[in-house]
Amino acid sequence: MTSKDETPDQEVYAFNADISQLLSLIINAFYSNKEIFLRELISNASDALEKIRYEAIKDPKQIEDQPDYYIRLYADKNNNTLTIEDSGIGMTKADLVNNLGTIAKSGTRAFMEALQAGSDMSMIGQFGVGFYSAYLVADKVTVVSKNNADDQYVWESTASGHFTVKKDDSHEPLKRGTRLILHLKEDQTEYLEERRLKELVKKHSEFISFPISLSVEKTQETEVTDDEAELDEDKKPEEEKPKDDKVEDVTDEKVTDVTDEEEKKEEKKKKKRKVTNVTREWEMLNKQKPIWMRLPSEVTNEEYAAFYKNLTNDWEDHLAVKHFSVEGQLEFKALLFVPRRAPFDMFESRKKKNNIKLYVRRVFIMDDCEELIPEWLSFVKGVVDSEDLPLNISRETLQQNKILKVIRKNLVKKCLELFNELTEKKEDFKKFYEQFSKNLKLGIHEDNANRSKIAELLRFETTKSGDELVSLKEYVDRMKSDQKYVYYITGESKQSVASSPFLETLRARDYEVLYMTDPIDEYAVQQIKEFEGKKLKCCTKEGLDLDEGEDEKKSFEALKEEMEPLCKHIKEVLHDKVEKVVCGTRFTDSPCALVTSEFGWSANMERIMKAQALRDSSITSYMLSKKIMEINPRHSIMKELKTRAANDKTDKTVKDLVWLLYDTALLTSGFNLDEPTQFGNRIYRMIKLGLSLDDEEHVEEDSSMPPLDEPVVDSKMEEVD
């Protein structure tokens, strides 16, 4: 029920009950994100301009009086008011009464319920009541509006339960449109500052289709001489000027006695001073246009570069760009950029998870929506502008929104397309891979749906590539006809893996081996079971499974049987340090090495996990499976050791040699020593043996060293206060 009290000047109306309750909530509750009021009011102004533009298409006469489309902001610090004016369609008297007070929108009650349930205040526009966000910062709102079909009217309210509407004869006339005057609360004067208003427009409304201008003060200093002051003196009334009869009697000769030189001196004596002039002018705030709304063929590289720098504040140009639109059941446009270099804090846990700004119909919504793009693509920067998402959708709703999931899927697809396009430009892809290879490998680990596509982008150095990087496809294409697996080795550096004993037989067979020296490779390769039908095989783990001829197999079986006693003896000496000791075929020059089980950690992975400060000790103990010592039965050291062990199993030298072989194998296989001191002592004993020195001989004490002083019982040092 609407009550109306008429006076000669104005008509007073009561707010609808739901609107009164909403205003009470807005005014009395505390909201930290009050800044959204400006976004809502600018969005409303933009909607009004869209309406008149649509009307003008049907009837051009609608914009005859005011052909310009604009949104203007004016901050008046003297009167503590912020004015938002637009040249939109405007409102009639009936519109002011109905839309701003007496007829509750269908979403009013729903929004209040959501607000009371703890939802974000920024949702207000979703329910069609964005205008009332003005009361977040204002205790009084004046709306002056002029529609082509009516006179100019003014609506005013302090949100105290009623509002007034009257024909306007006190404000500056509008040709068409609406002027909102916000009388700001005492604690909200920050919204009168030019810097703050510019910041909010850039953040929320930079890509509104219509020009947004702010009235700004411009200060200009100019230099003037004292002539102006003298001119002022001349303008004084005659009676104020001193009269002197003698001066009047001076002859013309005395006046003309002033020479040109004296005139010049007088000119020099004139003092100059600076005068400050303060003027106001309109400064356009949204000069950067939403270039994603244009066709990619219409946008130049220079425009993309300028937009990228404005969007990201990057001082360098982007490396690659993808500009596309999706149409059909779902409509959105997107512009994605790949930077030239990775940020130094890219993998910081507290860092923002993505750099994609989400817009709904050119209005900024948020830039921290973690569901918009997966974490492994967090380096990609850009904008997504949806036509289908509701304006000001809450974060909670956004996470469950089906539209967002479709957008995410399309963004990942387009990013992969962009990366594949980069592979065609060798130098650009090389720069990209240097900066973002870790992200791709993280994608292998996390993105099951796109794993095979990401794997195509991976590049590695190999035993045959020199300093060049090789893709998995290139590797598979040049595999030997008898090669069953894609072989790889993991390690700390290229230098360490290139000299690994595990490569000896593979090199002898002319098999290419991938070098995986990035710590994240260990995680990624666990997820890549095969590539183009070829399984990946780590050459530091058991089960290398090399094809051998019948003669080779028989020869190896004979050697294996011959070395069986030595294998047992080594196992007895090392006890639980190794799970078993076996003969192997993976070495040509090395006597032995330590391999791990097929499903356990490699030496490199063990090193990485031990470096984790917050690792799970239970998982560590489980995954640290016992090592397998694999010996080369054809090596001379092993043959001699077999002979000596057969002659005397208690020989201390043999035992020392076994331990020395084990410790050396730890190092050459990429593990850390369990007991470095013991290893050092064994080396020293071997040195003594080589020098024919007595192992039991002790180091002589240095007789030149003075004896130790007797311990001082009573300290003679002065006590320090």
From Swiss-Prot:
Pfam families on file: HATPase_c_3 (PF13589), HSP90 (PF00183)
Chain residue ranges for the region called Disordered: 219-273, 697-721
Disulfide feature: none
Biased composition (Basic and acidic residues): 233-257
Keywords attached to this entry: ATP-binding, Chaperone, Cytoplasm, Nucleotide-binding, Stress response
Transmembrane segments: none
Residues annotated for ATP binding in this entry: 44, 86, 105, 131, 395
GO MF, one annotated term: ATP binding
Motif (TPR repeat-binding) on chain: 717-721
GO cellular component terms, A-Z: cytoplasm
Locations listed in the record: Cytoplasm
Biased composition (Acidic residues): 223-232
Keyword ATP-binding appears in the UniProt entry: yes
Principal location listed in the UniProt entry: cytoplasm
InterPro entries, A to Z: HATPase_C_sf (IPR036890), Heat_shock_protein_90_CS (IPR019805), HSP90_C (IPR037196), Hsp90_fam (IPR001404), Hsp90_N (IPR020575), Ribosomal_Su5_D2-typ_SF (IPR020568)
Entry's free-text remark on domains: The TPR repeat-binding motif mediates interaction with TPR repeat-containing proteins.
Family as reported in the entry's similarity comment: Belongs to the heat shock protein 90 family.
Subunit structure: Homodimer.
Function of the protein: Molecular chaperone that promotes the maturation, structural maintenance and proper regulation of specific target proteins involved for instance in cell cycle control and signal transduction. Undergoes a functional cycle that is linked to its ATPase activity. This cycle probably induces conformational changes in the client proteins, thereby causing their activation. Interacts dynamically with various co-chaperones that modulate its substrate recognition, ATPase cycle and chaperone function.
Protein name from the UniProt record: Heat shock protein 90
Organism: Theileria parva (East coast fever infection agent)
